[in-house]
Amino acid sequence: MACSAARPPADQDRFIFIYPAYLNNKKTIAEGRRIPISKAVENPTATEIQDVCSAVGLNAFLEKNKMYSREWNRDVQFRGRVRVQLKQEDGSLCLVQFPSRKSVMLYVAEMIPKLKTRTQKSGGADPILQQGEGSKKGKGKKKK
């Protein structure tokens, strides 16, 4: 087996992986969350992670059909992972602001709520929920 130090850091096998479960505030640490729950995001998707990484200038690839091993739900919403390049060919960092995988995860979790797809969803869903709350759900039996 080849030593990982022998391969160049820019080799695609040396990219870091970010699964949505790493950033999900609905997961426990045992279920795969890797950042503090106060900084985690509600149900992030691999596409959102890739959008944030690409926007900041990181080299990121989306792998849609990959699944996190601890994810029990096989739904399409929970599939995917993102490969992110941290180091260049010579071993130097691609971006100085991201020295580690944890710094990338914290930045992505901070930026996902600011995405246009997130802000539009939350604004449009509130009026629909408020309309349905006024109805009663049937009668109970009277006590004698």
Swiss-Prot record:
One of its GO terms (cellular component) is nucleoplasm. Keywords: Cytoplasm, Nucleus, Ribonucleoprotein, RNA-binding, Signal recognition particle. Its main location: cytoplasm. The keyword RNA-binding applies. Disulfide bonds: none annotated. Component of the signal recognition particle (SRP) complex, a ribonucleoprotein complex that mediates the cotranslational targeting of secretory and membrane proteins to the endoplasmic reticulum (ER). Binds directly to 7SL RNA. Mediates binding of SRP54 to the SRP complex. Belongs to the SRP19 family. Component of a signal recognition particle complex that consists of a 7SL RNA molecule of 300 nucleotides and 6 protein subunits: SRP72, SRP68, SRP54, SRP19, SRP14 and SRP9. Interacts with IPO5, IPO7, IPO8, KPNB1 and TNPO1. Interactions with IPO8 and TNPO1 may be involved in SRP19 import into the nucleus. This is Signal recognition particle 19 kDa protein. It comes from Mus musculus (Mouse). The gene is Srp19.
